[in-house]
Amino acid sequence: MRSSPRSVRVFKHVEPLTIGAQLHRHLRGAIIRGEFRPGQALSESEISKQYATSRQPVREAFIKLAEERLVAILPQRGTFVVKISVADVLDARFVREAIEVAVVQEAATSATPSAVKDLRDLIAQQKAVAHGRAEDFLALDEEFHRTIALSVRRAHAWRVIEGIKAQMDRIRYLSLDDATPLSVLIDQHTRIVDSIEARDPVAAANALRAHLHEIIVSLPNIAAQFPDLFESE
């Protein structure tokens, strides 16, 4: 199945993102959301037409996606969306936990009252969308974790997390209808913020670990439910 043009999307030729970086971000999101399915071929020429750009930015985007193990570039055959690797998901979760635990412990010792308020505001927004589209909740979940990192000036740490968590995000989108109830995730977020506000780094680390453990619980069921989307391991 080849990628097919939808509406033409024109990327702006402006800084700070290059056209290739903008295209990478968009294609990455489409793969994570399942708009491009594992095994699907991505046509360089069709994508360049679809996004009204030359082929060079498409090649740049494909190379970056290959580095993230979201696509495979096969000489003489083409570029294909890779299947999900359970090992990659677990490895990404391991690395993310190691980084984010350190970040949340730092937040529990130095986050400002303003940062805590920002986090509680995000939790309030999560509650407001909990009975709506799950995609809206996932966006707020992402912003919650990003805000913790930025509250202690760990923007680079968050960029590292963003770079390795794509495989985890693919699972999250597959499990929208069969995942941990959003109310549970909101309670977990609340415990994280409570621990940060209480200046308790041990409790904050434990709360974050429990939160990131959810994917380990749901992963076997998701792999069994969608076997054609996963690598045989």
Residue ranges and their predicted role:
Residues 18, 117, 180-183:
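Short helix-capping and inter-helix turn/linker motifs at the boundaries of alpha-helical repeat units
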Residues 40, 73-74, 141, 184-186:
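Short, flexible turn/loop "capping" segments at secondary-structure junctions
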Residues 67-72, 164-166, 180-183:
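Mobile beta-alpha loop/short-helix "lid" or hinge segments that flank ligand
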Residues 109-174, 186-195, 203-213:
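Conserved amphipathic alpha-helical segments that form helical-bundle/coiled-coil interaction surfaces
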Residues 177-181, 186-190, 201, 205-233:
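C-terminal-biased regions
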